[in-house]
């Protein structure tokens, strides 16, 4: 089961948030799709995903995307994605 919590943070406060969930088993091959789906729900740009992001998610069950991880200009300090299905 996949359940992810997406939080857009600005000045250490949650500005927007959403959760996505799927009944399928979590796979890192689909990690980009999960991120895209959550960003679409938040009406936010989708970040570039590098190996560092996947490794942090695997190790700590959450990942932070900073404005430098986005191609487009974003108006927030970070996008946090947390795994709720541990």
Positions of PLM-derived features:
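Short, extreme N-terminal segment that most often corresponds to the first beta-strand
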Residues: 1-21
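Generic structural motif
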Residues: 11, 23-25, 84-86
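Short, flexible N-terminal segments of the mature chain
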Residues: 14-42
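Acidic, low-complexity intrinsically disordered segments
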Residues: 34-86
């Amino acid at each position: 089961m996949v359940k992810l919590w997406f939080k857009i943070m600005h000045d250490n406060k949650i500005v927007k948030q959403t959760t996505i969930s799927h009944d399928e088993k979590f796979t890192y091959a689909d990690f980009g799709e999960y991120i895209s789906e959550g960003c679409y729900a938040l009406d936010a740009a989708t970040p570039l995903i590098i190996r560092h992001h996947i490794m942090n998610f695997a190790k700590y069950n959450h990942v932070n995307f900073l404005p430098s991880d986005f191609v487009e200009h974003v108006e927030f300090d970070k996008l946090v994605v947390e795994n709720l299905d541990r």
